[in-house]
Design a protein with these regions (language model features):
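Terminal-region recognition feature
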Residues: 1-189
């Protein structure tokens, strides 16, 4: 981290919201409680360390960040620590690149959403077709949501969508230094 950046972002040393563990309903509750206890004006810092979890919870937390930024005009900084995997990267995508930081040695994990589903075909043929179509609709909608998140994550960076789309199926691990050089984060502290 440069001296200029250190002076510009002294709050990184004392985050307002500290999240760790699985991205789930319990994390969302903690996030909301900590956010409610934050100062009502000025810049905020949110940190996360996670091996992943529920991407929809990550999107909900990200929406809260976006709403605060847009309706209150507040700057909110993201600080990823140690591991920002999967749903953690989904949460990070809610922050503009210029408001993202990682600690030294942190790794990002970007991958495609996963699904495990058994489809039981039983009954009248038209009902079977409807069941198959419903499952296909679920997958197609999930792919669209995933691609929206990928585009948010790389917006303002040097990473082309096609590169992320190519690497995500095999779990793309990105070290902090590489994330900075790719423009996915502003700096490393």
């Amino acid at each position: 981290m440069t001296d200029t950046t250190a002076h510009k972002y002294p709050l990184l040393a004392t985050p307002h919201v500290r999240l760790h563990g699985t991205v789930d309903d319990a994390m969302y509750d903690s996030f909301c409680n900590q956010l409610a206890a934050c100062p009502k004006d000025g810049m905020l810092v949110v940190t996360i360390t996670t091996l992943g979890g529920d991407p929809e919870v990550a999107r909900a937390m990200g929406d809260d960040i976006r709403l605060i930024r847009e309706f209150q005009g507040r700057d909110i900084l993201f600080l990823g620590k140690v591991a920002v995997y999967s749903a953690g990267a989904t949460f990070m995508s809610a922050f503009p690149v210029e408001h993202r930081f990682l600690t030294h040695g942190t790794r990002l994990l970007l991958h495609e959403r996963q699904i495990t589903k058994t489809i039981n075909l039983n009954g009248p043929l038209r009902m079977v077709v409807a069941s198959l179509q419903a499952a296909l609709n679920e997958v197609e909608t999930s792919v669209a949501i995933e691609e929206e998140g990928f585009r948010d994550l790389i917006k303002g960076s040097k990473v082309p969508f096609d590169e992320l789309h190519e690497k995500a199926p095999s779990n793309w691990y990105i070290e902090a230094e590489e994330a900075r050089s790719l423009g996915l984060v502003l700096d490393i502290i």
